[in-house]
């Protein structure tokens, strides 16, 4: 390669770098304008926009019945509805109930009978499998919307704190690492690989504080979630802490 060819190559590289820098500058300018627009938008405190709470009239609204859930639980409905509504088979659902039973069983009081473990888990799975509508879940299981909210939070906390560390964990021994490496090479053709890393955005409601940190590149408020999977498509690590405005390139592979 002579001097002229080297000079042309260097010039082409400099031109490409200049184009990339220009593109980044344009993107930053658009982003700054968007952030400025949202920063100037007035936001009322949550206590001002919160509606006055109405006095409770019923434990459960008249007309709400758990008939659909009772039919499904008693095997009267079509068995395929388990997979369609809960994203798992009936045997898997029963196994999940047994593992969470020590943490979700409630004591009976003089007021009314508490929700059993099966109903609590069914409410949570139905909520997570759909678009997350409290009213729809409440109508399907014959409970109040506030009951759906408390149940979903309680079950999710039990799953993440009690079952999460057991099922979602990184390899801790050389034998486990070797098994992952050989599995990726055998089934997917990737050498020296123990996991596939990617991220996704989970949309959230606009926070009252530091809301611009959660505004992603699509103009929606979200949490940036990073996941690591093995060759069997099972999660081995999940990191849920990055606000939506953080770019994927800035996230470090935590604990990897």
What role is predicted for each listed range?
Residues 2-5, 133-256:
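Short, well-ordered secondary-structure "scaffold" segments embedded in the functional core
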Residues 30, 68, 78, 82, ...:
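Alpha-helical interaction elements in eukaryotic regulators
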Residues 1-107, 161-164:
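Charged, often Cys/His-bearing segments associated with DNA-binding zinc-finger transcription factors
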Residues 107-115:
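Short, surface-exposed loop/turn segments at secondary-structure junctions
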Residues 117-130:
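Short, amphipathic alpha-helical "recognition" segments used to contact nucleic acids or chromatin
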Residues 89, 123, 137:
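Short alpha-helical segments in extracytoplasmic peptidoglycan/chitin-binding modules
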Residues 101, 128-133:
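Short connector loops/turns at beta-strand edges and beta->alpha or beta->beta junctions
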């Amino acid at each position: 390669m002579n001097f002229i060819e080297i000079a042309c190559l260097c010039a082409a590289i400099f031109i490409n770098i200049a184009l990339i820098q220009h593109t980044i500058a344009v993107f930053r300018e658009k982003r700054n304008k968007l952030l400025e627009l949202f920063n100037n938008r007035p936001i009322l405190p949550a206590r001002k926009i919160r509606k006055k709470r109405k006095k409770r009239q019923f434990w459960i609204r008249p007309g709400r019945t758990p008939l659909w859930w009772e039919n499904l639980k008693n095997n009267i409905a079509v068995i395929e509805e388990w997979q369609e509504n809960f994203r798992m088979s009936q045997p898997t659902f029963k196994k999940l109930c047994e593992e969470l039973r020590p943490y979700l069983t409630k004591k009976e009081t003089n007021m009314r009978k508490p929700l059993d473990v099966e109903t609590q888990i069914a409410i949570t799975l139905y909520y997570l499998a759909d678009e997350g509508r409290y009213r729809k879940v409440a109508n399907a299981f014959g409970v109040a919307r506030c009951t759906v909210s408390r149940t979903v939070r309680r079950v999710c906390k039990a799953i993440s704190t009690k079952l999460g560390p057991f099922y979602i964990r990184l390899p801790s021994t050389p034998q486990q690492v070797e098994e992952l490496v050989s599995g990726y090479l055998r089934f997917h053709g990737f050498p020296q690989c123990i996991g596939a890393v990617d991220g996704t955005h989970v949309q959230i409601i606009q926070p009252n504080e530091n809301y611009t940190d959660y505004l992603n590149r699509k103009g929606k408020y979200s949490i940036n979630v990073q996941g690591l999977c093995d060759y069997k498509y099972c999660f081995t690590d999940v990191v849920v802490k990055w606000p939506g405005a953080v770019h994927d390139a800035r996230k470090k592979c935590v604990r990897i």
